[in-house]
């Protein structure tokens, strides 16, 4: 931090739909670029570990498991770095599916932030898949 400011970065890695392992490697490449520029806050796209357009594939346990494995790859990559990073992925808890941003830093998950406003208009059918967290 310099003069009360920190360097923030928005990274947009290449993404393959329903390929969390490949996406995790691309995310790690993007993080390296952010680390090289000394970013202390890094945000990645919504559902970047799976791609946004998986539709019914989000209901497959295999994709959810692979996205957690991809998150583990990213976690390992963040070890030794103090940048607070937000990584998007689907997350299932108690039979409910959430669209979350995982807050990670130095190899640790600090928390999961579920998407609050689930759209239900136009081309968005997120409400058919995701649960909005209770207030």
Across the structure, where does each feature detected by a protein language model lie?
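N-terminal glycine-/serine-/threonine-rich phosphate-binding loop
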Residues: 1-41
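Conserved small/polar residues in nucleotide/adenosyl-binding loops
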Residues: 130-135
């Amino acid at each position: 931090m310099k003069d009360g400011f920190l360097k923030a970065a928005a990274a947009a890695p290449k993404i393959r739909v329903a390929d969390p392992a490949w996406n995790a490697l691309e995310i790690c490449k993007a993080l390296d670029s952010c680390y090289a520029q000394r970013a202390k806050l890094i945000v990645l796209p919504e559902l970047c570990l799976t791609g946004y357009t998986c539709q019914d594939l989000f209901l497959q346990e295999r994709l959810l498991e692979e996205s957690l494995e991809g998150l583990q790859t990213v976690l390992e990559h963040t070890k030794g770095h103090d940048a607070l990073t937000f990584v998007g992925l689907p997350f299932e808890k108690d039979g409910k599916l959430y669209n979350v941003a995982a807050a990670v830093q130095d190899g640790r998950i600090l928390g999961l932030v579920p998407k609050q406003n689930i759209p239900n208009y136009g081309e968005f059918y997120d409400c058919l898949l995701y649960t909005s967290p209770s207030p």
